[in-house]
């Protein structure tokens, strides 16, 4: 592998594999609010929060760490109490205030737009000062932090387009000689996500597939109820990080318990998950944890079982594509664990069946499969507005 590709992949990994506390969309809201640096939250006269459909869905009914609350309002309040330097760990160490929640509730206006990832905050205080922040396109891409219309800083995006042009062979070459800093990152990812397993969400037994389902769903449930425990997110999604890692961790536990093979397989899964995300989008009407994290998991599992066998890897991608893509995303919630259970079954069964190119949207190889799923994901984009309308009718 040439040096440029290796440097590019390493940079992407360091940007896209990060700790997140709670569902990444409530973390996104909290981070955006915290960027406004409000010294006295009780001075706020009004606060306007603008979210794209996907961010609204994922924050609507999910637990917010250190609040014992669910949804968008406590995420805003938590952001006012948090430190922007913590980014997606913004709720770390906050002391929640019910009094502040009651105060903000009367002053918060939420607007939902049809857009790629977008979280904008506008705050006006009782002295006439205005504070703004805008995060768009990815969860850490801060575009506008302003005080009284003065730009504080601006951060540009990454080499996403170049990464999208890489091939599966590039990822396989990269994991042959992994930089030490990335080995440490993968080890941290394994430890952090494994630590999320708390009891049983679904307990089907002790065979390999059951262990995959048990561990993956338990970790997902821990995140979705808002436990004060970080996950290592992949492509800015904690659940996608769980789907891309825990099925492989469980498979290794039930089979060889080979640390070197586990690290390579996890890393390959993560690289594929990021690739699939860049080919489509961070958020969409299609469940990314299953369609993107699941594709990562199946490629990682197939590598663990069969090594660098392109024929087998293409076969696994085809079989996975014939199964689960198309599952809708109706927001972050406890029910996400059930979707990840389906993802585990689809990934595992893809190791043993070869579905041919003639079936439905199945591509000839891994790359075509990812591109076809991405195309379906983009076509499904208009569904988000309808999903949000249905969710907004609820009183919770």
From Swiss-Prot:
Keyword Transmembrane: no
Cofactor note: Binds 1 [4Fe-4S] cluster per subunit.
High-level lineage: Archaea, Methanobacteriati, Methanobacteriota, Methanomada group, Methanococci
Active site: 23 (proton acceptor)
Binding partners and assembly: Homotrimer.
Transmembrane spans: none
Keywords: 4Fe-4S, Iron, Iron-sulfur, Lyase, Metal-binding
Family: Belongs to the L-cysteine desulfidase family.
Positions annotated to bind [4Fe-4S] cluster: 287, 329, 336
GO biological process, one term: L-cysteine catabolic process to pyruvate
Matches recorded under Pfam families: SDH_alpha
Domain of life of the native organism: Archaea
Function: Catalyzes the cleavage of L-cysteine to form 2-aminoprop-2-enoate and sulfide. The former then spontaneously hydrolyzes to pyruvate and NH(3). May be responsible for the production of sulfide required for the biosynthesis of iron-sulfur centers in this archaea.
EC numbers, comma separated: 4.4.1.28
Xref: InterPro entries: Ser_deHydtase-like_asu, UPF0597
GO molecular function, one term: L-cysteine desulfhydrase activity
Protein name: L-cysteine desulfidase
Cofactor(s) needed for function: [4Fe-4S] cluster
Catalysed conversion reaction: L-cysteine + H2O = hydrogen sulfide + pyruvate + NH4(+) + H(+)
């Amino acid at each position: 592998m040439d040096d440029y590709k290796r440097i590019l992949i390493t940079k992407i990994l360091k940007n896209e594999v990060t700790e997140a506390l709670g569902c990444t969309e409530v973390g996104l809201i909290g981070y955006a609010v915290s960027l406004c640096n409000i010294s006295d939250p009780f001075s706020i006269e009004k606060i306007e929060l603008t979210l794209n459909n996907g961010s609204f869905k994922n924050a609507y009914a999910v637990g917010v760490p250190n609040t014992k609350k669910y949804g968008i309002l406590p995420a805003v309040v938590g952001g006012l109490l948090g430190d922007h330097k913590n980014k997606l760990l913004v709720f770390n160490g906050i002391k929640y205030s019910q009094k502040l929640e009651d105060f903000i509730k009367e002053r918060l206006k939420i607007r939902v737009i049809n857009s790629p990832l977008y979280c904008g905050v506008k705050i006006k205080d009782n002295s006439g000062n205005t504070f703004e922040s805008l995060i768009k396109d990815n969860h850490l891409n801060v575009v506008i932090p302003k005080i009284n219309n003065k730009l504080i800083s601006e951060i540009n995006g990454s080499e996403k387009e170049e990464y999208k042009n890489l091939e599966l062979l590039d990822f396989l070459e990269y994991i042959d000689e992994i930089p030490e800093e990335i080995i440490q990152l993968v080890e941290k990812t394994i430890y952090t996500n494994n630590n999320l397993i708390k009891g049983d969400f679904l307990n089907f037994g002790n065979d390999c597939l059951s262990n995959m389902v048990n561990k993956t769903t338990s970790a997902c449930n821990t995140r979705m109820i808002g436990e004060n425990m970080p996950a290592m997110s992949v492509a800015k999604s904690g659940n996608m990080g769980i789907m891309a890692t825990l099925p492989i961790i469980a498979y290794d536990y039930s089979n060889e318990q080979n640390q070197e093979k586990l690290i390579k397989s996890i890393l390959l899964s993560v690289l594929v998950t990021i690739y699939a995300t860049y080919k489509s989008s961070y958020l969409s009407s299609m469940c990314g944890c299953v369609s993107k994290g699941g594709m990562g998991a199946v490629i990682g599992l197939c590598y663990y079982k069969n090594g660098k066998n392109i024929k087998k890897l293409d076969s696994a991608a085809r079989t996975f594509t014939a199964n689960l893509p198309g599952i809708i995303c109706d927001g972050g919630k406890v029910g996400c664990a059930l979707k990840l259970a389906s993802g585990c079954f689809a990934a595992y069964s893809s190791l043993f069946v070869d579905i041919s190119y003639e079936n439905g949207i199945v591509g000839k190889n891994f790359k075509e499969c990812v591109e076809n799923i991405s195309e379906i994901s983009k076509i499904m984009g208009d569904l988000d507005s309808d999903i949000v309308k249905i969710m907004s009718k609820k009183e919770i």
